[in-house]
């Protein structure tokens, strides 16, 4: 099945915790059918930047409808996998924004680590990681 365009509006920061609890905890099944575990400590991490809180809904969209998944590009985190997506704020948004979700592969499944809009130079670095999965066009 071809990838669906990811159209997800920004959420209100005041709704972030409710959305986090409803959409992501205790786990999400990703595009490959794997379980990604999410816990309250992950929300504390996301709270560090308002931009991340406004994009809670983008985390679910990126885990379930990514453009690609790559192995981590950093030698110190060989167990990291990164979901890459372009998310559009509305049907009228023609550019969208890149969005990445990082998870760590553990013994029991995948553990959520982070999610953010990467700088273009950092996205280039992420894309140096080995391709694990790619959406069909």
Regions found by a protein language model. Give the residues of each.
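Ribonuclease/tRNase effector modules and their secretory precursors
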Residues: 1-137
């Amino acid at each position: 099945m071809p990838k669906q365009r990811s159209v997800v509006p920004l959420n209100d920061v005041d709704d972030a915790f409710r959305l986090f609890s409803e959409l992501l905890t205790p786990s999400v099944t990703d595009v490959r059918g794997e379980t990604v575990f999410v816990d309250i400590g992950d929300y504390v991490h996301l709270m560090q930047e308002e931009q991340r809180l406004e994009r809670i809904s983008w985390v679910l969209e990126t885990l379930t409808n990514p453009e690609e998944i790559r192995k981590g590009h950093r030698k110190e985190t060989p167990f990291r996998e990164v979901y890459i997506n372009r998310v559009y704020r509305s049907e009228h948004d023609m550019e969208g924004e890149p969005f990445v979700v990082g998870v760590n592969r553990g013994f029991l499944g995948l553990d959520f680590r982070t999610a953010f809009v990467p700088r273009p130079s950092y996205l280039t670095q992420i894309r140096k990681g080995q391709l694990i999965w790619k959406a069909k066009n």
